[in-house]
Amino acid sequence: MGNSEIRIQDGRTHFDVQKQVKKKKTITELREMRRNARPITWITAYSYPTATVAERADIDMILVGDSGGMVELGYKSTNPVTMDEMISMCKAVRRGAPKTFVVGDMPQGSYEISDEDAVTNALRFIKEGDCDAVKLEGGERVASRVKAIHNLSLIHISEPTRLRRI
């Protein structure tokens, strides 16, 4: 038993108990934390082992950054990182941190061409990568992409309840 583990009477460790009670933060909870100036813990991870440590440390959010192309895949820049590579890293992170809010970083070329591309690739992060949100860069020049993805999110969040009632 390591120094950081605390044994409970029935033999489980503190981490075993923590795994059972940890609940993934929702976007609403994260917004409330920000509004109330409560710290939000955030880490960048690209792999199962790192995500496992983040989950055990009760980190609020994990960013799966396109920098994983340099750190994990050996690229000289983030330019060559593909959607498939990002999805693979997101899946590994999700397996390691099933109860942590995961954000997928949309790589260069996955959203710049059209709103449709942005939505299609954002959906891949959500469906295939099992991410809770996506991140893209570009400020005002990508405002229409952000709006298209945001509109998708609103439909995605509100429709399942209606579908169950039909």
Language model features with spans:
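Active-site beta->alpha loop and helix N-cap motifs at the rims of alpha/beta catalytic domains
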Residues: 50, 76-145
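N-terminal glycine-rich anion-binding loops that anchor highly charged ligand groups
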Residues: 43, 52-71
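N-terminal amphipathic alpha-helix/helix-capping segment at the start of soluble metabolic enzymes
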Residues: 2-44
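Single conserved hydrophobic/aromatic residue that forms the stacking wall/gate
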Residues: 155-166
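Surface-exposed amphipathic alpha-helices with a cationic face
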Residues: 22, 31-35, 55, 90-95, ...
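Hydrophobic faces of well-ordered beta-strands that scaffold small-molecule active sites
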Residues: 41-44, 62-64, 102-106, 134-136, ...
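Conserved functional loop/turn residues at catalytic and ligand-binding sites
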Residues: 58, 66, 129-130, 161
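Short, well-ordered coil/turn segments that N-cap beta-strands
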Residues: 37-40, 59-60, 98-102, 130-132, ...
